[in-house]
Amino acid sequence: MANYFNTLPLREQLAQLAQCEFMNADEFTDGVDALKGKKLVIVGCGAQGLNQGLNLRDSGLDVSYTLRDSAISERRQSFLNASENGFTVGTYQELIPTADVVLNLTPDKQHTSVVNAIMPLMKQGSTLAYSHGFNIVEEGMQVRDDITVIMVAPKCPGSEVREEYKRGFGVPTLIAVHPENDPQGHGLAQAKAYAAGTGGHRAGVLKSSFIAEVKSDLMGEQTILCGMLQTGSILCFDKMIEKGIDAGYASKLIQYGWEVITEALKYGGVTNMLDRLSNPAKVKAFELSEELKQIMRPLYNKHQDDIIDGTFSRTMMEDWNNDDANLLKWRAETAETHFEKTPAGNVEIAEQEFFDNGILMVAMVKAGVELAFETMTAAGIIAESAYYESLHETPLIANTIARKKLFEMNRTISDTAEYGCYLYNHACLPLLQDFMQKIDTDVIGKGLGEHSNQVDNQTLIQINTALREHPVEKVGATLRGYMSAMKKIV
């Protein structure tokens, strides 16, 4: 199979990259009607598979699960997830031929083998749905001409898909129809109904393309969402230890600090995050972030270039074929980092202290969010899509670090995201070595204190203006307006 994106003419590549339209609430007045009375069969029952299935069933749809024979006979976790929640579970041969819609919610690396196994069993005129377009775009999967191919991609981990639905809300979602596979012209109606069934229509739905979703999703998860948080955790912790700060305190400041800091980001963007700092600290964080952006911009450009031309996917798939040798080695190395092995201390850290003593962390989040957004939009990805794949998801990933450090983050995200995270981390750590030599405890570990409390008014005005005028803040203000019912993470 050939990389689908690379087979397209340039104009078509650009058109699909730029495909992103925010859908109005009145476009979802039909709810799940387009899927009512149809049999939905989900392949796989991990985090996304289980939680999407629960939501779809609670929305009145007919949902069952199909798993590999071995998963059923050995009563693996996927089988227990489905059966203990009262779903019908069967083999591919038992359930796929009866399905009107097959939802492929297995891990990326299994998509080709899964689709090749189920496609001969799918009935004429049925629909194949994905929640990530990697198999179509990067692997170039060719689906039977009579089958409709759609995507519904919630922009958060599966657990949040369920929790927000139970609150009567939902999570922002991207939907798309594969232009090569919409023989009956009902792909969009079915994708909208699927999004409504998961609750996504209550938080905002972007009508996108498989290509735009994949290229932006890969970029966000490799850089700000996972790579920058892992790199920042290691660098900030090691610096505090070098400067004599208690290891337990340093561990707790990092582990829980990302979550607290990005909670402010979630509600009011980069502007609100920096507004949580004192004026002197805000100036310092802004200056540090601008320096970080200058240093890291070439790395962000390289990641985006490698994603666009398929270099990243080709490299990762070579590792798949080598039994994930690099992925597993890098995962083991991460487990041995000093930060990962140092438990959080039994010390109380007030909410504001995370900001006051984590100025560098704030600067890293700002730099990472803005760079990811700027790099994506420069590559032709529309601002709304770039926002969801940078700023919006950062608090959700930070929340996983708060639970069980980098182990939990890398366990929760996909193997695809984890592989890209390690690539970024390995390149960024040495890139920031000289920068970190200049860092002291005033910006990570202890705070500025009272010895530096003077701020030039003109400088502060310029910084505040620059923060509020950044394009990620402008599009973010609009999109957050659709998410006013968001729950607090902390």
UniProtKB/Swiss-Prot annotation:
Molecular functions per Gene Ontology: ketol-acid reductoisomerase activity; magnesium ion binding
Gene name of the encoded protein: ilvC
EC number: 1.1.1.86
Binding-site positions, NADP(+): C45, G46, A47, Q48, R68, R76, S78, D108, K109, Q110, G158
Domain named KARI C-terminal knotted: residues: 209-353, 355-486
Known cofactor(s): Mg(2+)
Record family assignment: Belongs to the ketol-acid reductoisomerase family.
Pathway as given in its UniProt record: Amino-acid biosynthesis; L-isoleucine biosynthesis; L-isoleucine from 2-oxobutanoate: step 2/4; Amino-acid biosynthesis; L-valine biosynthesis; L-valine from pyruvate: step 2/4
Domain KARI N-terminal Rossmann: 17-208
Protein name as it appears in the record: Ketol-acid reductoisomerase (NADP(+))
Binding positions (substrate): S414
Sequence positions that bind Mg(2+) 2: D217, E389, E393
Known function: Involved in the biosynthesis of branched-chain amino acids (BCAA). Catalyzes an alkyl-migration followed by a ketol-acid reduction of (S)-2-acetolactate (S2AL) to yield (R)-2,3-dihydroxy-isovalerate. In the isomerase reaction, S2AL is rearranged via a Mg-dependent methyl migration to produce 3-hydroxy-3-methyl-2-ketobutyrate (HMKB). In the reductase reaction, this 2-ketoacid undergoes a metal-dependent reduction by NADPH to yield (R)-2,3-dihydroxy-isovalerate.
Disulfide bridge partners, by residue number: none
Residues involved in Mg(2+) 1 binding: D217, E221
PANTHER family reported for this sequence: KETOL-ACID REDUCTOISOMERASE, MITOCHONDRIAL
Enzyme class: oxidoreductase
UniProt KW keywords: Amino-acid biosynthesis, Branched-chain amino acid biosynthesis, Magnesium, Metal-binding, NADP, Oxidoreductase, Repeat
Annotated GO biological process: isoleucine biosynthetic process; L-valine biosynthetic process
Recorded GO CC terms: cytosol
Catalyzed chemical reaction(s): (2R)-2,3-dihydroxy-3-methylbutanoate + NADP(+) = (2S)-2-acetolactate + NADPH + H(+); (2R,3R)-2,3-dihydroxy-3-methylpentanoate + NADP(+) = (S)-2-ethyl-2-hydroxy-3-oxobutanoate + NADPH + H(+)
PROSITE patterns tied to this protein: KARI_C, KARI_N
